[in-house]
Amino acid sequence: GHIYGPTITETDSRASAQFTQNAIEGEDIVMKSAGMQMRSYCYVLDCASAILTVLLNGKSGDAYNISNKASVCTISDIALALAHAGGQKVVYENATDEEKKGYNLMSNSSLDAAKLEKLGWRACFDLEEGAEATVKYMKKLRG
């Protein structure tokens, strides 16, 4: 899944990282599409606990999807959550033909974490809580 949280760097080019940068810098988030592609997002602390769960309870050699079913949403949804957490808004603009060339055309890349959940793992942060924690902590780090 797509891991987000206060671990992003200023050079991180992922959409969620750019949205976070906008939110903590007091800028509106500009979307160059409707952002209707579905993605699996997972807050970084939930990701860490998922990895620990696999290390403690998983079967060696097996693969496990890390995904929070409460945070499977559109790209627009995460933009709105981060904008709200930062007191900003999301603005939708038309993309140039050049910008459209870089789009990921996959409409749904959400993951199923049922196998991980069978090991006893549960996410603690929904999308709004993760967005709030991310923006709050990043603002504190930046002073």
Protein language model features and the residues they cover:
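Glycine/proline-rich active-site loop of Rossmann-fold NAD(P)-dependent oxidoreductases
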Residues: 4-18, 27, 32, 44-45, ...
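An acidic site on a long C-lobe helix of protein kinase domains
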Residues: 15, 43-47, 74, 126-127
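C-terminal lobe/hinge of AMP-binding adenylation domains
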Residues: 34-36
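Conserved C-terminal active-site "lid" loop/helix of NAD(P)H-dependent oxidoreductases
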Residues: 44, 63, 74-76, 99-122
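Non-catalytic, hydrophobic alpha-helical segments
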Residues: 47, 51, 66, 75-78, ...
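Mid/C-terminal beta-alpha module of Rossmann-like enzyme folds, strongest
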Residues: 57-101
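Amphipathic terminal alpha-helices
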Residues: 127-143
